[in-house]
Amino acid sequence: MTRLSWTEDAVGVGKVCERGFTVARDGNMVPGVLWYPTAASAPRPLVLMGHGGGGHKRNERIVMLGRLFAGDYGWYAAAIDGPVHGGRGPVTDASDPAYRQMWQRPEIVQEMIDDWRATLDALSTLRDVDSARVGYYGVSMGTMFGLPYVASDQRVRAAVLGKAGMTGSSVQRSGIDTHFKTFASKVTVPVLFMMQWDDERFERDGQLVLFDRLGTQDKRLHAYPGQHADNAPEAFEVAAAFLKRYLERGEA
């Protein structure tokens, strides 16, 4: 059984409200943040957002995306802390020993799948969340956990993934290639896969192999110059436009 509890009062800035929450799952508390439009008057799509390694539910990029999705597109957007990140542990950088130790737990990916499932269960009880129109955004660690989740939850209609692959230093540290081999072919929803051409953590060829392994036929690959932490200025708007194509299809 899952239960949503608000941990903060809603704070409104312009067209967007932000509010912290926790989801209870099997005795564990999953901390998260919800962004939503102040003027929502009908059920709206929901985008689940996974942060990168060393990040947390309120890091700069996640907050920017939450405000973009809620303020410019009128959607709900939610982020939760990954294991041992943010309110769940000490990791503030992917080089922390605790980050490597996290990946040594064979059950860690399934636990995060269950956390996301429980979070969606809980948020779906909100009046203005349209649980039939759910998207996912997550690159780097957001894909390492998010790809298996998207493959496992048929409620997700489209996903933005990337900055991850089958080879590279991050793969050697985490062993995530084993999970990608299990789950990539089970991803059947539309996917936008974004990669950095000179990524120093996930090798270029390994990212292309992961893209090829995705089971969906509705997929596209966007490559940008730069290293792992770089972002093209248009990349986030491209991601939002991709999600809009599937989450708002059929709207008047």
Regions inferred by a protein language model and the residue ranges of each:
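N-terminal cap/lid segment of alpha/beta-hydrolase-fold proteins
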Residues: 1-42
